[in-house]
A protein has these predicted regions:
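Short, contiguous clusters of charged residues that form electrostatic/catalytic patches at enzyme active sites
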Residues: 96-103, 107, 150
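Conserved SAM/SAH cofactor-binding pocket of Class I
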Residues: 107-150
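Non-catalytic substrate-recognition/targeting regions of SAM-dependent transferases
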Residues: 8-22, 29-96, 103
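N-terminal accessory targeting/assembly segments
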Residues: 1-4
């Protein structure tokens, strides 16, 4: 996986035995990540705004710790602005590990020196579509996830 070091509105604050603490602009979230199997070297003990708790019946729910957490908020990456919210499946609607791919997509579109048309199938939350549009491409965004297209 390629990393980007300039996603100023996103930061991993801690990782500990299946849990990850992240800062999304000014919102601090703690949520499960099954790939984190190691103990924290520097535990994050400050307050978090919300914690996602898995249910043993499947799925889970957000436990809001800060009553002032906004229902939606924005983060920026370069000149892109994304609207986030707490989603039912432990995420926020944005996947920061994809930022490298957004960079590559934008670079390829800008370097094409021709009209570029992008068909983004299974586009889900749309960050790649936004990145392609920002680079000048014509984009068709297709997804069947009701929460993403409403």
């Amino acid at each position: 996986m390629k990393l980007v070091r300039d996603f100023n509105d996103y930061q991993i604050l801690d990782m500990d035995k299946g849990m990850k603490v992240e800062a999304w602009h000014n919102v601090i979230l703690k949520r499960p990540d099954p790939q984190i199997i190691w103990p924290s070297l520097n535990p994050y003990n400050a307050k978090v705004d919300a914690i996602y708790n898995r249910s043993n019946k499947g799925g889970g729910a957000w436990d809001i710790k800060n009553a002032k957490i906004p229902a939606t908020w924005q983060v920026t990456y370069h000149d892109l602005t994304f609207n986030l919210k707490l989603m039912g499946f432990k995420h926020t609607g944005l996947f920061p590990e994809q930022a490298y791919n957004w960079n590559m997509l934008r670079m390829k579109i800008k370097a094409a020196n021709r009209e570029v048309k992008v068909l983004n199938l299974f586009a889900y939350t749309g960050a790649a579509s936004v990145a392609a549009l920002s680079a000048g491409a014509s984009v068709v965004h297709v997804d069947s996830s009701r929460g993403m297209i409403d």
